[in-house]
């Protein structure tokens, strides 16, 4: 009993405030008090007032909120509510919200310290946990967009999503304005699009318009160079294909007369400097038909050697897998006529674009993050510390993925209009890539070791990914161990175990055979798994997202489709090259989508810089502060390093990494 001081914070996005009246209740261990009608919340503001409570409440557990409307339901975005108990020595309690309050239902906000089911030994939050998860499971249902792929949220359109998963107004306006600009560019380029074919490589300058980056300019000027071609496997938009060779690939059948090449490859293999990039997943994928015109795919293998100065140079390209009973496919080398070698590299770059967008970017980034998001909402109540740890890294993921399924990979979407894997092939490729998606491949310490990339001084992706993983893991361990003091506490947390099973058994459709756990038996294992989730939603997505505008804007460096079959002889000409590369319409579509996806966003939260305080207690704040300090130190290190590099690598700079999959 006594006078309580109450503060209420409203979000800063457009329409976050409300003209409706808000009622509050305080719920303590020993009683409950109705505070009545207290405010009409204003956007980006903090309201403060005092209330004299006659009941003895004891330690506070919840604040209950109800928004009352008469004619119009004007939703309110509540950040948090703070309550300070009576007297100068009264305890201050923080109740995080960070969600929309709408309708007339009563919303219960638990005190923000967070607790597991093991910590909640008195069952003070048990009923709240059960009721919240029951409601969430009806709101967040699993969907199956396409048979054979991992599951997604059940939402055919944005309006089907729970309101808390939709873009807030500032994000929506910025995103949709960019879409309008892309449409206008297509209209402006209509005269170019009516040209049926480019005549020379210089013609691609017609669509290389303003808005490109300095790196895109460098790509345009250097894309033909072998060292530049090899660099992209180390530090380009898709650093996920390259691995160190431990033997010559079985598919590498040498045609007669290539004994010297075979000897060279064996020599590099013995030295440990032989690397490969195998696009075998594209083998057997049906190519698209665009406007009645057949498109083509290849499944290249690239063999590369690591030079003493750190350059990675291609030494052989095989465009297709050998077929039983057929003549071995040709192997292209740098000693071939320049046009043959350039055409072979263009085929590799086109194949890399297909795998980048579907495997590295969509599957390993967007779709995995969506599985984590849906499982988290279904299995972890808002009072759970792992929910609090994860939720900033799940912001906007569901909406951006619904938009992708509606606009990019849908029937008559961008893939069908411009990509050689469109028309259904992209769906088959997603399924095949999913079958090769392992737990270890999502964890840089395991993935980089398995691919033999840890000791390459010029592989800045590997260096930065490993550093970021280590920083994230220390952050996760620090937060996790505040609530889990023993391995048994992990084993006994049935909410945490349910969340893990939901990801592996349900979302990933039974991925135990690929190393994903169905239970968490120790603090170390749980922290590793949670680190994987956060890394996937942040750093890994950024590593393959941020480079799109740099590496894919110059169309010949990443052709969205190929209009002639892969060459079987070495007699390429400029006419054949131009007839193979995308036509003007396809090129325009490519750069517009690349710009939309790859542009730097006005509304962007850097890694670890979320303003939401889901952990208000001092111990957790100290862990977050240390995390941010380590990120800032790494950011400065990368900035200094990049000044000495010919090509700066910035895709894993913490200040550039998005805090969630939001674009």
UniProtKB/Swiss-Prot annotation:
Topology within the bilayer: Peripheral membrane protein
Pfam families xref list: Lipoxygenase (PF00305), PLAT (PF01477)
Molecular-function GO term, any one: potassium channel inhibitor activity
UniProt keyword ATP-binding, yes or no: no
UniProt keyword annotation of Chaperone present: no
UniProt keywords, alphabetically: Calcium, Cell membrane, Cytoplasm, Dioxygenase, Fatty acid metabolism, Iron, Lipid droplet, Lipid metabolism, Lipid-binding, Membrane, Metal-binding, Oxidoreductase, Phosphoprotein
Lipoxygenase domain mapped to chain residues: 116-663
Positions bearing Phosphoserine: 149
UniProt free text on domains: The PLAT domain can bind calcium ions; this promotes association with membranes.
Entry-linked InterPro entries: LipOase (IPR000907), LipOase_C (IPR013819), LipOase_C_sf (IPR036226), LipOase_CS (IPR020834), LipOase_Fe_BS (IPR020833), LipOase_mml (IPR001885), PLAT/LH2_dom (IPR001024), PLAT/LH2_dom_sf (IPR036392)
Pathway stated in the Swiss-Prot or TrEMBL entry: Lipid metabolism; hydroperoxy eicosatetraenoic acid biosynthesis
Name of the molecule in the record: Polyunsaturated fatty acid lipoxygenase ALOX15
Location within or outside the cell: Cytoplasm, Cytosol; Cell membrane; Lipid droplet
EC number in record: 1.13.11.31, 1.13.11.33, 1.13.11.-, 1.13.11.12
Residue positions binding Fe cation: 361, 366, 541, 545, 663
Cofactor note: Binds 1 Fe cation per subunit.
Cofactor section: Fe cation
Quaternary structure annotation from Swiss-Prot or TrEMBL: Interacts with PEBP1; in response to IL13/interleukin-13, prevents the interaction of PEBP1 with RAF1 to activate the ERK signaling cascade.
Family stated for the protein in its record: Belongs to the lipoxygenase family.
Job description of the protein: Non-heme iron-containing dioxygenase that catalyzes the stereo-specific peroxidation of free and esterified polyunsaturated fatty acids generating a spectrum of bioactive lipid mediators. It inserts peroxyl groups at C12 or C15 of arachidonate ((5Z,8Z,11Z,14Z)-eicosatetraenoate) producing both 12-hydroperoxyeicosatetraenoate/12-HPETE and 15-hydroperoxyeicosatetraenoate/15-HPETE. It may then act on 12-HPETE to produce hepoxilins, which may show pro-inflammatory properties. Can also peroxidize linoleate ((9Z,12Z)-octadecadienoate) to 13-hydroperoxyoctadecadienoate.
